[in-house]
Amino acid sequence: GVSSHQIESIDRGFSFLKEDAPLDMRMGQAEQAVTAGDIVNLASKKELYEIFTKLGEESHARAISDAIVRARRIKALMTTGELAGIIEKEYHLGKNVPDFITAKDDKRVFQALRIAVNNELENLKEAMPKAIELLALGGRLVVISFHSLEERIVKLAFLDFKKRGMGEIITKKPLIPGLAELKVNRRAKSAKLRAFEKNI
């Protein structure tokens, strides 16, 4: 998954708070060809809508997709600041939307693009069974998810492992960060930890 180091690296383009960053978002810049900029500038309105809806769970996906398509007809969107500006200025123009609401829209759109660029959900689905196979007897598979779609994949995988008699789910409910953790690491706010112990 994405790391804090990658988020803080301005040349990676993961954060809408880094205004001059290129729209990249590739975790493996050497291996991957398609960037977030490619998706934003080349995907159809319908494709953008589906990405923002399915991967970002963005309720304003249609309006934001419309705004992006209108803007790129005039000029290709090259930076994170330009994309955030479309969301903030074009979509919210004249609607007196509070900054914290705008920031949530930014976050969901950027998150959806990052997931799409890196094929994160499919990679997680493929990694879960491979990880459990590599574990020794008594080994534990511990997964921290930051997104509801990721968490669902982990939950269903663990239930499948248990059904197949491979072991036991240690965390009946996901563990979430406490106040002490959140004070020093705000990015842990949406984190959920699940663990499975292999017994065969």
Residue ranges: model-predicted function:
Residues 1-200:
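S-adenosyl-L-methionine-dependent methyltransferase catalytic core, i.e., the SAM/SAH-binding region
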